[in-house]
Amino acid sequence: MKFVDEASILVVAGDGGNGCVSFRREKYIPKGGPDGGDGGDGGDVWMEADENLNTLIDYRFEKSFRAERGQNGASRDCTGKRGKDVTIKVPVGTRVIDQGTGETMGDMTKHGQRLLVAKGGWHGLGNTRFKSSVNRTPRQKTNGTPGDKRELLLELMLLADVGMLGMPNAGKSTFIRAVSAAKPKVADYPFTTLVPSLGVVRMDNEKSFVVADIPGLIEGAAEGAGLGIRFLKHLERCRVLLHLIDIDPIDGTDPVKNARIIISELEKYSQDLAAKPRWLVFNKIDLLDKAEAEEKAKAIAEALGWEDKYYLISAASGLGVKDLCWDVMTFIIENPVVQAEEAKQPEKVEFMWDDYHRQQLEEIAEEDDEDWDDDWDEDDEEGVEFIYKR
């Protein structure tokens, strides 16, 4: 299936149903009073993370999602039916962004996690709500409010423990094929890898980690050169980055310059990503003598000002790969992911249900007061009849 990691969709929540103006009519009850019911609430639009999905390709074709409108109120104090909700399933790792404000609405990082992206409209009030001692036959009602409408940008970011960086043909795909069951395409030309891929590295029956391979970067990627930096976002959730360097490039380029290009592109994309733990890994050492490879790796590390430990491996022959993987596993165990507890704060809304309906009732009451006739005269027949019956 084609890998798609970005999609734009429109979500529209259902409008609230309108209130009803109705009066009770039964035999021998000529004036039964108001019995108009309230409308129903509009349906909501939800996002739900599903671990069985791995691409956003479905939302390249289906771009609009609309929840059901609430039904209008009816006579006999019947409340309208609430509109049905709409649930949009997305892969785990999807980030939801409101294109109108640029605000990140949420990150879908757990299977079954749900996120409200569009709230349905509130129901309108029927005329039963407006009856009072001075208004026995109210003909007022309120309409339901419109539901939320948003244009959303969905960004899929892979969930991996380890991310791989490097120039094209640095051996990233060969490495992931050597340590996992993933089989990305491998060839002797640049940009063989066109989309990110994941591989699970199993060290034993209990220990494993996930590694992500992204297309190679070249100079000017931040400005859109090559495949650009659009795939770097898949490394934002990684705990450690493996920077693969071809120790003896076949095209004759300088390994030091190549390494600096990767570092520069990381810093241009995100300072947070550039600050992540990054390990230097020299690949293709099988093409050189052991002493020559060690000497060259030391010279490159010194030129880069690298003072930490570095690794010499051959992804093709497996030399040094197992030791590197065990060190990565140890690092992951010693640096577990810290789950920040979400602060339990009240839901941020513009106004609450009770406030809205109370305001509607107060406005109607003010209108009734303005229209009230303080001077009683013979034309007020309804008032005379009412007083007589009491």
Curated annotation (Swiss-Prot):
GO terms for molecular function: GTP binding; GTPase activity; magnesium ion binding. Its EC number is 3.6.5.-. Residues 160-333 form the OBG-type G domain. Mg(2+) binds at residues 173, 193. PROSITE patterns: G_OBG, GTP1_OBG, OBG. One of its GO terms (biological process) is ribosome biogenesis. It is found in: Cytoplasm. GTP binds at residues 166-173, 191-195, 213-216, 283-286, 314-316. GO terms for cellular component: cytoplasm. Gene3D superfamilies: GTP1/OBG domain, P-loop containing nucleotide triphosphate hydrolases. Pfam families: GTP1_OBG, MMR_HSR1. SUPFAM superfamilies: Obg GTP-binding protein N-terminal domain (SSF82051), P-loop containing nucleoside triphosphate hydrolases (SSF52540). Residues 1-159 form the Obg domain. Keywords: Cytoplasm, GTP-binding, Hydrolase, Magnesium, Metal-binding, Nucleotide-binding. It comes from the Bacteria. An essential GTPase which binds GTP, GDP and possibly (p)ppGpp with moderate affinity, with high nucleotide exchange rates and a fairly low GTP hydrolysis rate. Plays a role in control of the cell cycle, stress response, ribosome biogenesis and in those bacteria that undergo differentiation, in morphogenesis control. HAMAP family: GTPase_Obg (MF_01454). This is GTPase Obg. It comes from Escherichia coli O7:K1 (strain IAI39 / ExPEC).
